[in-house]
Every structure is written in structure tokens, then in C-alpha cells.
């Protein structure tokens, strides 16, 4: 397989019509019949909650999927690099750096 020049893949056809072409089938100006209508020319900024998404739309469960189905699992492995350097040389160097920092801080504070 040539990774620099992969074979072409045909994109699958869209399972639904484009979003912008649908017209609302409900009355928009007074969509809540129990409440009085808003002022003339008023349009709500966002429609109310319409329930669950239809099957086939993004984020909707498949039509024949059981309700008790587990969510998809993505396995993530976390690897930590830990130094196991317990030599005396390393301990001496750490002590020297600590003493140097303390001396510098003491000089700055006094």
C-alpha cells in the first residue's frame, strides 16, 4: 500500500435532504396556544425543545438499536515515563541544587 497516494474513496450519499430546504409545518407566530401571542413582527430567536432527534439524523440512535445497548468504547492507554535513578550521584546533585536555591532566596530576602 502506498501511504502517499491512497486509493480514492467514493463518499456515501446523504441519508437526508439538505437542511436549508425544509419548511416548518407548524404555525410559527403563535406556536404556544395557551399563551397570548407576542408583539406584531416578533419572531422567537429559537424554537422550543422539539423532543428527541429523528432516526437517521446526526446524534440519533439507529432505528433498530435496543435501548439497553452500551455506549461505544474508546480505549486510551496512558504511559508515564518514570526515572528510576537512585544513585548517590543523583542524590548529591539534588541536594546541591536545593542548597543553592535556598542560598539565593536567603540573599534576596536579606
Curated annotation (Swiss-Prot):
Keyword Lipid biosynthesis annotated: no
Keywords: Membrane, Transmembrane, Transmembrane helix
Main location: membrane
Regions crossing the membrane: 87-104
Compositional bias annotation for Low complexity: 19-29
Family: Belongs to the CYSTM1 family.
Record protein name field: Cysteine-rich and transmembrane domain-containing protein 1
Organism: Xenopus tropicalis (Western clawed frog)
Gene that encodes the chain: cystm1
Amino acid at each position: 500500500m502506498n501511504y502517499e497516494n491512497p486509493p480514492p474513496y467514493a463518499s456515501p450519499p446523504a441519508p437526508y435532504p439538505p437542511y436549508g430546504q425544509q419548511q416548518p409545518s407548524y404555525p410559527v407566530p403563535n406556536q404556544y396556544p395557551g399563551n397570548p401571542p407576542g408583539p406584531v413582527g416578533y419572531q422567537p430567536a429559537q424554537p422550543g425543545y422539539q423532543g428527541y432527534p429523528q432516526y437517521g439524523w446526526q446524534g440519533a440512535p439507529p432505528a433498530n438499536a435496543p435501548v439497553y445497548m452500551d455506549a461505544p468504547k474508546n480505549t486510551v492507554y496512558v504511559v508515564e515515563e518514570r526515572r528510576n535513578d537512585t544513585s548517590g550521584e543523583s542524590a548529591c546533585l539534588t541536594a546541591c541544587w536545593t542548597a543553592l536555591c535556598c542560598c539565593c532566596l536567603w540573599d534576596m530576602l536579606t
